[in-house]
């Protein structure tokens, strides 16, 4: 690092250690654990602080609905199941990064060294260099709050459970317009003026999309479908989606997304 001709003296040396672990459960009756109190990972990929924020995003809207009497306490159980799933994903990716950086076996070291040697000269090997893949929001596949995917032509990246990707629109960006409400995103299909289920308001947001002029919106939310309707949670994860507006299906999905269906 300093060069072979530079004289230096070590003043202090320490061994850096960390742990990748989590609690068995994040909810214990009226006590809820989040952030480092619930799970710990290595610093690779900035997964510690980011996962703590994701815990808060997941918990706060559920807690508010329960406190306001608009959802049963069982909704908080989904915080446990979803964020345990997210913690396991972070621990897996964090462990893979640290195992690449500090191999635990001779075979792993041979693989790591070969990847580093090849990546210097060949582009195909560079994605294999695992120096800490950056943290990404978790897709809650299999969540009890998800409804069955009714948009088979839609993109996989916005399936139920997935975080909403941002898109540039004529008047700004999509995510700031979603806010922290339940939102019914209607693309190339009529939207209702307003809808309320068991005291929970559902705010409609209608967008038109020409795939020729807004390819990002089309690729991320339409796929091969000409139109789409998305039910979006307050933490901006997809709860359900359909090819067109159907009030009965939407009300049922909203009840399911609040542990009432």
Predicted regions and their residues:
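FAD/FMN-dependent oxidoreductases across multiple families
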Residues: 1-47, 93
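Secondary-structure transition/capping motifs at alpha-helix termini
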Residues: 1-6, 59, 65-73
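Alpha-helix capping and helix-loop boundary segments enriched in small/acidic/polar residues
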Residues: 17, 21, 46-51, 70, ...
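Catalytic cores of eukaryotic secretory-pathway lumenal/extracellular enzymes that build
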Residues: 44-50, 57, 76, 86-90
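Helical substrate-recognition/capping region of FAD-dependent monooxygenase/halogenase enzymes
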Residues: 67-261
């Amino acid at each position: 690092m300093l060069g072979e001709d530079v004289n230096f003296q070590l003043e202090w040396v320490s061994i850096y250690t960390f742990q990748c672990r989590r609690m068995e459960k994040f909810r214990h009756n009226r006590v809820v654990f989040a952030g480092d109190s619930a799970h710990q990972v290595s610093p690779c990929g900035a997964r510690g602080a980011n996962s703590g924020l994701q815990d808060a995003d997941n918990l706060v809207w559920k807690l508010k609905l329960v406190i306001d009497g608009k959802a049963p306490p069982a909704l908080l159980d989904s915080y446990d199941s979803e964020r345990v799933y997210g913690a396991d994903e972070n621990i897996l990716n964090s462990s893979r990064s640290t195992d690449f950086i500090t191999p635990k076996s001779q075979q792993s070291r041979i693989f790591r060294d070969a990847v580093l040697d090849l990546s210097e000269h060949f582009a195909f090997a560079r994605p294999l260099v695992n120096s800490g893949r950056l943290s990404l929001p978790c897709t809650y596949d299999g969540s009890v709050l998800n409804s069955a995917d009714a948009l088979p032509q839609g993109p996989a990246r916005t399936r139920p459970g997935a975080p909403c990707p941002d898109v540039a629109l004529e008047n700004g960006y999509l995510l700031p317009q979603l806010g922290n409400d339940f939102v019914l995103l209607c693309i190339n299909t009529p939207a209702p003026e307003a809808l309320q289920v068991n005291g929970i308001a559902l705010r409609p947001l209608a967008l038109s999309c020409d795939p020729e002029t807004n390819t990002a919106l089309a690729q991320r939310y339409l796929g091969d479908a000409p139109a789409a309707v998305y039910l979006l949670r307050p933490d901006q994860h997809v709860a359900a989606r359909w090819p067109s507006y159907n009030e009965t299906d939407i009300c049922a999905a909203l009840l399911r997304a609040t542990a009432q269906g």
